[in-house]
Amino acid sequence: MRDPIETVMNLVPMVVEQTNRGERAYDIFSRLLKERIIFVNGPVEDGMSMLVCAQLLFLEAENPKKEINMYINSPGGVVTSGMAIYDTMQFIRPPVSTLCMGQAASMGSLLLTAGATGHRYALPNARIMVHQPSGGFQGQASDIERHAQDIIKMKRRLNEIYVKHTGRDYDTIERTLDRDHFMTAQEALEFGLIDKVVEVRDVSADESK
């Protein structure tokens, strides 16, 4: 059975742009990157994380002051891969606007709430899910104990990040993330994960850019 992601990538449309040097063809994602749009789509893993971080760093080099727009539709994934994206978002100089379309679960929700304050959005039918990290280990008892200690430290660190970006107190975050907690876009707004639920694009904001 073919990899569904590979199948989708083979169907990525090309767009043709007219320039004074003639025509130039781009795949649709490269063309959107020119508009400072990045997609975080699908499971968060090392390969995807590397590409997203590279795009963030490239856009910073292109213009260190102009906003970057990150569109998120992700079920989450590997914590360390997501943290690489998170740290890069905080590290670069341009503000990163985030928008959830579809879902932002697990690490996807952390990346959504990590956007620049006032610029974290969700479409009306988006779903957001937060929870504590999970994992499984096997081996010697002492190694299992060390892994357990490490994931507890990671849980604490993730809770602190949600506290920072939502304004909620630590105990509230810990209780909310104890089990899978699903939210509508409106509930995510009330919780502090996002700043606005958007139904249509703000045309006036686009015209002012």
UniProtKB/Swiss-Prot annotation:
GO terms for biological process: protein quality control for misfolded or incompletely synthesized proteins. Gene3D superfamilies: 2-enoyl-CoA Hydratase, Chain A, domain 1. Keywords: Cytoplasm, Hydrolase, Protease, Serine protease. It catalyses: Hydrolysis of proteins to small peptides in the presence of ATP and magnesium. alpha-casein is the usual test substrate. In the absence of ATP, only oligopeptides shorter than five residues are hydrolyzed (such as succinyl-Leu-Tyr-|-NHMec, and Leu-Tyr-Leu-|-Tyr-Trp, in which cleavage of the -Tyr-|-Leu- and -Tyr-|-Trp bonds also occurs). HAMAP family: ClpP. Cleaves peptides in various proteins in a process that requires ATP hydrolysis. Has a chymotrypsin-like activity. Plays a major role in the degradation of misfolded proteins. This is ATP-dependent Clp protease proteolytic subunit. The gene is clpP.
